[in-house]
Each structure stands twice: as C-alpha cells, then as structure tokens.
Amino acid sequence: MSQPPAAHVPVLYTQVLDGLQVTENGTYLDGTFGRGGHARGVLEHLGPGGRLLVMDKDPEAIAVAEQTFGGDARVSIHRGSFAGLGQVVAAATVDGILLDLGVSSPQLEVAGRGFSFGKDGPLDMRMDPDSGQSAAQWLAQATDREIADVLWTYGEERQSRRIARAIVARRAEQPLLRTAQLADLIASVMPRGDSKTHPATRSFQAIRIYINRELDDLETGLDAALAALKPGGRLAVISFHSLEDRIVKQFMARYAKAPPSNRRLPEAQPFVPTLQLVSGAIKADDAELNVNPRARSAVLRVAEKLELRIGDSLLERRSGRIPNPQSPIPASQGDAR
C-alpha cells in the first residue's frame, strides 16, 4: 500500500484504509479533512465511478481541499461539522465514513490559531474562527464555577478549582488574551511534580473541547454516520483522549451487543444488532511512532453496519432509520427485535 505524502503524515494511515475496505466504485465520506492525508489514500483506491465527500468546519482545511481536489470530479467539498453530515448525504448511501477527531497538526502548529500552549498567539481555539466565542471571550465572562466545571468535565483536571480561581483573579488585573499568558498562569499555580506533560495540557484540551462543542458534535455525528451508512458500510473513528474514545466505544457496543438482562423486568424483545465490531482498539506500532510521535495517543475503532434479516424488523437499512436497541419496536411496525 502506498504511503501518504511526506509533508503530512496522517495517523494510522494504513490501518484506516484497511478498516474502510475501500472499493473502486464506492462512496466515502471523510468528516474531518484536515490536510487530506487519509482522503488522498481513499482517492488512490477509487475508480472513475467512485465518490469522495470531504467535510471540515475549518475554513483553512476547506481551502486546502479545494486547492488539492477541486478539479477532481469524484470529490465534493463541504464546509461544516461532521455532526451535520446527514445534510450532505442521504440515508443509507455511503460505503465508509472516517472521523479523525480532535485538533489537527496544522491547527496546533500555527500560533495564530490559538490552540497551542507552546506557541504564543491569540487565545482563540475555535476550529471555525467565524463562529462562536473565542477562548479569550469565554474566559473573560465565565464564573470560576463554570471554568472549573469545564476543566474537570473535559480535561479531568484535578486542580480545576485552583486554576479557575487564578484565572478570575488575573483577569481582574488584566485581560487574558494570549495563549502564553494562560499557559504561564496555569503553570504558576500547579503543584510541582515530575510529570513530563506541560501543566497546561489538560486545561487547554478542556477549553478547546468546550469552545468547539466537540463531544456534542461527536455524539450527534455518530448517530448521523450510522444512518448514512449502507448495509456493509464501515465506520472508522480515530480518537486521541479517553473522553472521545469512551463515547465511540460505548456507541459501537450499544448497537453491536445486547444490553445486560434484568431479572426484575419483563423479558425484553430479542436484541438485533445494528453494528458488528470489526476490531477492538487499534494503536500505532513502534515503526509509526518513530515517524509520527503524535500517533502515540491515537486509538482507531472500526465497525460495520449490518443488514437486518427479513422478519427481524421493517426498519430496513435502506430507510436509514436507526432502531434503538434499548427499545422494543411496536408490533404494528413488524416483528419485535
């Protein structure tokens, strides 16, 4: 299998393409284009009748997509979050969907985007700079309780209250407008330890996730992806921290495995799976880590959408409607699951 261009090294490149099982005339959707590393790999396997849809909420990523693939009739480009992919594709029409979650390498590397605590820049953190509040705007008006809740919920930061109090105290003296200001402030109030991780890592992650509604988008996007897939279509998701991976793992398990039985409740309708787990957590090997250290925290999960047998349910895959495995289907809609 060919390798991606050296200028951009997408994580788990070979594993993603193997997981998607790209076919020559298939339809695929990359919901997080970034700089197009995975998308290039998909295109290499598509023939003239294949189709690739790419999405990204970052206008800079969309500009790269248009410059790189704008002349390719097989590619259609859409600006927006993958949470809205149902507005881009019809139900049960896609053979494979990739979601590569979190912040992209270019976003981290450009100081002006305000994502990095290692490079001073405006305290922004928005993946779509034309939408919503910047991190600086939110920190300027949030209460210490709200800040602490965000740091704990999205960063699992144990010192969330201490950091929140410090932010509120500092902004009373001067506005927090730069990433270096915030990173230095957090470092100054954190207990000294032997950790090799920068003391602002969890806080920056938490604020970024909150500002961009990343976990909300993920939950909505997973539901939309399942509806969009054809029977036999595959969903591949790369996550970079435990909060994301937990949501992905639980989503796939919910539609692939029967819920635990409860002897105190009436016997439930037979469970009919909607997904089949193709693999457990896939991580980068040593060879990839030597080339791309960012892959160290990456976790890939792949699942395949199943076709319901005749009689299992009248909610057929081609309708795109997703049966809830926790709820029985009324008898009027067909055989109970």
Curated annotation (Swiss-Prot):
- Residues bound to S-adenosyl-L-methionine are 36-38, 56, 82, 100, 107
Which UniProt keywords are listed? Cytoplasm, Methyltransferase, rRNA processing, S-adenosyl-L-methionine, Transferase
Reaction(s) catalysed (UniProt annotation): cytidine(1402) in 16S rRNA + S-adenosyl-L-methionine = N(4)-methylcytidine(1402) in 16S rRNA + S-adenosyl-L-homocysteine + H(+)
Q: Which InterPro entries match?
A: RsmH, SAM-dep_MeTrfase_MraW_recog, SAM-dependent_MTases_sf
Where is region (Disordered) located?
A: 317-337
Query: Which GO annotations describe the biological process of this protein?
Result: rRNA base methylation
Localized where?
Cytoplasm
Query: Is Transport among the key words of this record?
Result: no
Q: Taxonomically, which superkingdom?
A: Bacteria
Task: Provide GO CC annotations from the record.
Answer: cytoplasm
- Look up the coiled coil feature and give its residue ranges: none
The family this protein is said to belong to: Belongs to the methyltransferase superfamily. RsmH family.
Q: What does this protein do?
A: Specifically methylates the N4 position of cytidine in position 1402 (C1402) of 16S rRNA.
What this protein is called in its record is Ribosomal RNA small subunit methyltransferase H
**Organism in which the protein naturally occurs:** Xanthomonas oryzae pv. oryzae (strain KACC10331 / KXO85)
Per UniProt, what is the name of the gene that codes for the protein in this document? rsmH
